């Protein structure tokens, strides 16, 4: 026995694996002796106290066969095991890896039920012949009595169905859908998908059948989409019922710091000079040509002269009322007194222009 264990270790070394150490070989010998001692006691007990016909030198398979026979199972010489009286046919014998080709009559295996959705066809051009694929137009009328069991009658009735759909004799035939089957690419739907195929709309140009949003008067539809250039839509008065639009400047700290009243000279500028200041974005002033209508689009002057710069004037220190006055932060080379700057944070009121 010692030589056999040593030979096994030597064979493992010849196979290219690591040669076990002396302590590992000793542990393997001790473990094998313990296993064989336990097996010998089991065999002795079965022979003494049980009705088991075990050979003198038997292995574990013999013990398993004996236990199966006592429990009412039958073990054939090739290892096929089954309950007594429920011998499976030859075609249903399990394969070498243990899988059964079909469930045995006495097994608890139940085949899974059929899926709730219709199987997809092999081709994306025609509906499956195994499902109900008749064409229904309008209600429950069947064109030509076409069923899904045959493909040739379905192909023959294609011109008939197209003529029915395009004919004016049937004004009420609006809905064209397929019950079951699929005419799209074969896609496996999820388990939670509905079993009914959605309808195909064919009444897009019919004036009598309109979507529900076409006839209703929704105020959010014209306001949420930009109007066309030739058609202007006034906003709904209901949208502006709770708003108060103030003509005063916004309550922004930057806006209040630009000028005490940047547009207070608007009326005087119209009468005195050709340049006026029009409110633009962020409270800035833009030079425009005089004589333009008040609500017309602002046209910028291409070549603005140098005397229009912030705080500059052609008359020296005498600033004309129509020019833009720069705020104190933009005067880089000048010193501004602290008392000339008034902070009006959080207030929408503008103070009068100091003269």
From Swiss-Prot:
Keywords: Brassinosteroid signaling pathway, DNA-binding, Growth regulation, Transcription, Transcription regulation. Residues 1-34, 78-131 are annotated as: Disordered. Residues 18-102 are annotated as: Required for DNA-binding. The keyword Kinase does not apply. May function in brassinosteroid signaling. Disulfide bonds: none annotated. It comes from Oryza sativa subsp. japonica (Rice). It holds the Pfam family BES1_N. The lineage of its organism: Eukaryota, Viridiplantae, Streptophyta, Embryophyta, Tracheophyta. Residues 100-131 have a biased composition (Low complexity). Residues 1-16 have a biased composition (Gly residues). GO terms for molecular function: DNA binding; DNA-binding transcription factor activity. Belongs to the BZR/LAT61 family. Interacts with PUB24. GO terms for biological process: brassinosteroid mediated signaling pathway; DNA-templated transcription. The keyword Signal does not apply. Signal peptide: none annotated. This is Protein BZR1 homolog 3. The gene is BZR3.
């Amino acid at each position: 026995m010692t030589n056999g264990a040593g030979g096994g270790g030597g064979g493992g070394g010849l196979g290219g694996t690591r040669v076990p150490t002396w302590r590992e070989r000793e542990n393997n010998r001790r473990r094998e002796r313990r296993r064989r001692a336990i097996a010998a006691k089991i065999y002795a007990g079965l022979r003494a106290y049980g009705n088991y016909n075990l050979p003198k030198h038997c292995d574990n398979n013999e013990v398993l066969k004996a236990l199966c026979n006592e429990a009412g199972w039958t073990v054939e010489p090739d290892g096929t095991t089954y309950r007594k009286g429920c011998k499976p046919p030859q075609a249903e014998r399990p394969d070498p890896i243990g899988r059964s080709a079909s469930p045995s009559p006495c097994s608890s295996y139940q085949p899974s039920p059929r899926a709730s959705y219709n199987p997809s066809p092999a081709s994306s051009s025609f509906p499956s012949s195994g499902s109900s694929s008749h064409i229904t137009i309008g209600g429950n009328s069947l064109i030509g009595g076409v069923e899904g069991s045959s493909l040739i009658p379905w192909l023959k009735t294609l011109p008939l169905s197209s003529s029915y759909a395009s004919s004016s004799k049937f004004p009420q035939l609006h809905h064209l859908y397929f019950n079951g089957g699929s005419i799209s690419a074969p896609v496996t739907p999820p388990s939670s998908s509905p079993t009914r195929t959605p309808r195909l709309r064919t009444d897009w140009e019919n004036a009598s059948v309109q979507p529900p949003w076409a006839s209703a008067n929704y105020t959010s539809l014209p306001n949420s989409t930009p109007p066309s250039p030739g058609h202007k839509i006034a906003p709904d008065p209901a949208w502006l019922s709770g708003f108060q639009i103030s003509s005063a400047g916004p309550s922004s700290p930057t806006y209040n710091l630009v000028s005490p009243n940047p547009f207070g000279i608007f009326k005087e500028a119209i009468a005195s000079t050709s340049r006026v200041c029009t409110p633009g974005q962020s409270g800035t002033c833009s030079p425009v040509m005089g004589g333009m209508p008040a609500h017309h689009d602002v046209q910028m002057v291409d070549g603005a002269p140098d005397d229009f710069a912030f705080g500059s004037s052609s008359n020296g220190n005498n600033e004309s009322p129509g020019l833009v006055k720069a705020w104190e932060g933009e005067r880089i080379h000048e010193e501004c007194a602290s008392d000339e700057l008034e902070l009006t944070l959080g207030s929408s009121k503008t103070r009068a222009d100091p003269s």
